[in-house]
Regions:
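N-terminal amphipathic alpha-helix/helix-capping segment at the start of soluble metabolic enzymes
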Residues: 1-32, 148-154, 290-339, 547
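Extended, intrinsically disordered, low-complexity segments
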Residues: 2, 282-332, 356, 370-395, ...
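Active-site beta->alpha loop and helix N-cap motifs at the rims of alpha/beta catalytic domains
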Residues: 3, 56-188, 319-320, 328-438
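Conserved, mostly hydrophobic/aromatic
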Residues: 30, 91, 160, 203, ...
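Short, acidic/polar
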Residues: 38-50, 94-99, 250-254, 337-345, ...
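A structural motif
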Residues: 53-58, 106, 198, 262-263, ...
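Glycine-rich phosphate-binding active-site loops on the catalytic face of alpha/beta enzymes
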Residues: 57-60, 106-122, 259-275, 482, ...
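Catalytic alpha/beta core domains of metabolic enzymes, predominantly
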Residues: 127-144, 149, 171-321, 401, ...
């Protein structure tokens, strides 16, 4: 049972992968995946060793054919000769026979339910009678059980790895593109594992959409509990991208689950060198797990809240905050910031700027300001903020919107009476608890349970230097992920006791909102990290496409190394660029292929031309 308000690890069955354990009482493991050709032993070993030296505890390699699967023996032998015992994981798609071979040489084999025995997707609805559907499940069992027997004989672990982008037409036809369909795709395999008493199983459910990823994993946890299954989970956001956006997107999804105690191993998938993923994953794990043993947070879940299928908490709109409005962003001016000279990104200007005890002399046209209540004079576009101990003064100040800072544990009768009497008040939820998520959740559920519809802005305070900006971004994204996906967030206010620029804090807040699918402020790139299947220069291609499309706010562009997830993830993108073979690229509009096998040297130009022409038609 998940405790919304207090951090503790979910109890998962122990699984042995080579010399390390996943689940049970083992720490959360971090891993990455090579991008080299799996037939190139020297290149794979060199890259695997870089991953291991960075702190990676498992290394995954693509094994698209029998040759690649057999070469795992050579890669494994060379790593052992070099003194490394790190387990290798074979990544198998489209060919169940390859999984049989890989199980002989890898410590773990990942199979994808979407393409293990089901034919390649053509995105067509197929009508099955119940009897025909049962026959398909029998075919799956007949093929999967021999593989499990090989794994049992060789002490090889199995990962059932479902990707939102590669669901089979069979699952899509019966369940649609839904969390229920994704979960059922996994459960079909788990039921066979349980029937065969094969317990050396790890599960993953991934998507590039953080909301789908988190909600689907929550549903899977619920379904497994109902079936008395306790397999460990591997977490990741597929095609997260690169740079700050990729890190923030990963932290929103992975962090939301880790914060609820879910996850036994993680991978942060970045379109960068694989060893660059490890420090990011390690920081996320360390940041969340240090909450263990925190002071108990007393909280009661609101009766209308659903952890598995959350909807936005009902609130009354105050100005542009709450109701059906997108969440707002509030920025604080630092001691050395001049309100008139601070420059914000034009598409990421804060909705409100907090100025402390005095307003700037020359204010920006149309900009809204927040000022301490005892300095508030009622000037246009200015709003007062009250600390929780100034609740008695709220009624004496006239303003269309007022802000009240609250923390769980404040005298509830006093603040509830104030909020009931003053619906114009926006709550600013703060916490200095080690488990700030639990405390901020508990406060918001308390409001909800007592019929209070005041919007809630979550204020998060950090202490980082400018050199640690990436750490702040990961922590803020992890802290806000669950609050946003739970439907509790009406605004974000990031503050920092350090020299990180206010513009960087504001940009981070907007990036977190976009990663959680709550507010769009820039072009979004759904790009995979690449693997041995990728046959073009992924990183330079991403850079070219970004340079040409960064101004296209609101557009989602998929950049995928191969067809494993490519066409499926295109359903979540407006346009796509997908590897189609050596030196060849196919272009997509959503999941419809519009140009096939374009020479790589011409493909970016073709994509940009197609986007331009298509947008003109609209």
């Amino acid at each position: 049972m998940i405790d919304l308000f207090n951090y503790r690890r979910r109890e998962a069955s122990p699984v042995q992968v080579g010399d390390i354990q996943l689940g049970g009482d083992a720490p959360i493991r971090v891993q990455s995946m090579t991008t080299t050709n799996t037939n190139d032993t020297e290149a794979c070993v060199a890259q695997a060793e870089r991953i291991i030296k960075a702190g990676g505890e498992l290394v995954r390699l693509t094994t698209q054919g029998r040759r690649e699967a057999e070469n795992l023996q050579n890669i494994n032998a060379q790593l052992r000769a070099d003194g490394y015992t790190t387990p290798l994981v074979a990544d198998v798609h489209f060919n169940a026979n390859v999984a049989d071979v890989a199980a002989l040489y890898a410590e773990k084999v990942r199979v994808n339910p979407g393409n293990y025995v089901d034919p390649a997707r053509v995105f067509k609805k197929i009508e099955y009678t119940d009897a025909e559907y049962a026959d398909e499940l029998k075919k799956l069992e007949d093929r999967f059980v021999p593989f499990l027997n090989i794994c049992r004989e060789h002490h090889t672990a199995v990962r059932i790895g479902v990707n939102h982008g590669s669901l089979s037409d069979r699952i899509m036809s019966r369940y649609g593109d839904t969390p229920e369909g994704i979960v059922e795709s996994c459960m079909e395999f788990l039921r066979i594992c349980k029937k065969e008493q094969f317990d050396n199983v790890v599960i993953s459910i991934k998507a590039s959409n953080t909301v789908i990823m988190v909600r689907t994993v929550r549903l899977l946890i619920t379904e497994m509990d109902n079936a008395d299954m306790h397999y460990p989970l591997h977490l990741g956001v597929t095609e997260a991208g690169e740079g700050e956006d990729g890190r923030i997107k990963s932290a929103v999804g992975i962090g939301a689950l880790l914060a609820d105690g879910i996850g036994d191993t993680i991978r942060v998938s970045l379109s960068e060198e694989p060893e660059a993923e490890i420090p990011v994953a390690r920081h996320l794990v360390d940041y969340i797990t240090k909450r263990a043993g925190h002071t108990l947070v007393p909280g009661t879940e609101a009766k209308d809240f659903s952890w598995v299928r959350p909807e936005r908490r009902p609130t009354r709109a105050m100005g542009y905050i709450g109701g059906s409005n997108v969440p707002v962003v509030i920025a604080s001016l630092g001691q050395n910031d001049d309100a008139e000279s601070v420059e914000f990104n034009p598409d990421m200007t804060p909705d409100y700027i907090y100025c402390g005890g005095s307003l700037p002399k020359n204010r920006r046209d149309g900009q809204k300001y927040i000022v301490d209540f005892n300095a508030y004079t009622g000037e246009p576009n200015t709003y007062p903020i009250f600390p929780y101990n100034a609740t008695p003064f709220v009624g004496g100040v006239k303003a269309d919107v007022k802000f009240l800072v609250l923390q769980l544990g404040a005298p509830s009768e006093e603040y509830m009476a104030c909020l009931k009497a003053h619906p114009e008040v926006v709550v600013v939820a703060v916490s200095n608890q080690q488990n700030r998520l639990g405390e901020q959740r508990a406060l918001t559920h308390e409001l909800w349970s007592n019929g209070l519809f005041n919007p809630v802005v979550f204020a998060q305070m950090y202490s980082h230097t400018s050199a640690e900006k990436a750490d702040l971004q990961l922590e803020a994204a992890a802290d806000m992920g669950a609050l946003m996906i739970d439907g509790l967030c009406d605004g974000v206010w990031l503050m920092n006791n350090g020299d990180i620029a206010v513009r960087d804090l504001t940009d981070t807040a907007f990036a977190i909102l976009q990663a959680a699918r709550l507010r769009t402020s820039k072009t979004e790139y759904i790009s995979c990290p690449g693997c041995g299947r990728t046959l073009y220069d992924l990183r330079s291609t991403i850079a070219k496409i970004k340079a040409a499309t960064a101004h296209m706010k609101g557009l989602k562009i998929g950049i995928m190394g191969c067809i494993v997830n490519g066409p499926g993830e295109m359903a979540d993108a407006d346009y796509g660029y997908v590897g189609a073979g050596p030196g060849k690229i196919s272009l997509y509009k959503q999941k419809m292929c519009v140009e096939k096998a374009i020479p790589e040297s011409e493909a970016v130009e073709h994509l940009l031309r197609f986007i331009e022409e298509d947008r003109k038609e609209k």
